[in-house]
Regions:
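Short hydrophobic alpha-helical segments that form membrane-spanning helices or hydrophobic packing faces
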Residues: 106, 154-156
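Short, conserved alpha-helical segments within structured domains
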Residues: 13, 49, 130-138, 158, ...
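Short linear motifs at protein or domain termini
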Residues: 1-92, 96, 227-235
Length: 235
């Protein structure tokens, strides 16, 4: 956490660590067990084994936040409402600072989704799983390129919570033709947002994205999940 170790670094031997910290082998191994459970290290067994440093994983934070939300009775609608607060603000910020590379990456994501929609309309056998991943990636790009790390981390935690909660509901209830049409509308909305960003129209981009999020909320929480349902990570 102090930045003294990098991802992939190998920790010293057990003997060296015991001497360095003045602890017993059982205490050290218990510390290893806890850090491994928190995805802070990975342990390889054998002659060439040892403990390797892992980068902090957002999914670990999301798991604990999700549990806290569930225990406090937070609804999935409340989680989505928080995204509605964060994303338009991020879009406004992005419009004032966007670079050409940001526009290129957003356009590439939209184009990939457009091609998937066209292919899915022509071939009912094509899976739409990639569509959901691309949609999340577009939102993720907006947050990442807005340039506020605190906002990006908070959004990432909320995304992981929503993905976990909605995964089974979406797979059960989504009608394919409705899903294809929803992705088609997303392509149109995403393209419009990119145009606002290209023009550096921060107010227009923010208004458009808030409307997009409101419409998406009615679709997502109206057909695929109960907005009043408490966050559930164990379905």
């Amino acid at each position: 956490m102090l930045g003294e170790l990098r991802e992939g670094d190998t920790l010293p031997s057990e003997a060296d660590l015991m001497a360095q910290f003045g602890v017993s082998r059982p205490t050290l191994r218990e510390a290893f067990r806890i850090m491994e459970a928190e995805s802070l290290i990975s342990i390889r067994r054998g002659a060439r084994g040892g403990a390797r440093v892992l980068a902090p994983d957002l999914s670990v934070a999301a798991r604990y936040v999700g549990l806290l939300l569930q225990l406090s009775g937070t609804t999935i609608g409340e989680v989505y409402d928080t995204r509605v607060i964060i994303e338009p603000a991020a879009v406004h910020r992005l419009a004032t600072r966007r670079k050409e590379r940001d526009l290129e990456d957003l356009r590439a994501c939209v184009e990939e989704l457009r091609k998937l929609v066209e292919a899915a309309k022509a071939d009912p056998g094509i899976s739409l799983d990639a569509g959901s991943r691309l949609a999340w990636r577009f939102h993720e790009l907006l947050i990442e390129r807005a340039g506020n790390r605190a906002m990006a981390i908070q959004w990432g935690v909320l995304r992981d919570v929503m993905e976990t909660h909605l995964a089974s509901a979406v797979s059960r209830s989504s009608d394919r033709s409705d899903a294809v049409e929803s992705f088609r509308r997303s392509v149109r909305s995403y393209s419009k947002l990119v145009a606002f960003l290209e023009a550096k129209d921060a107010e227009g981009a923010q208004r458009h994205w808030r409307k997009h999020m409101d419409v998406s909320s009615k679709i997502l929480l109206g057909t695929e999940a109960d907005p009043k349902a408490v966050v559930d990570l164990f379905d």
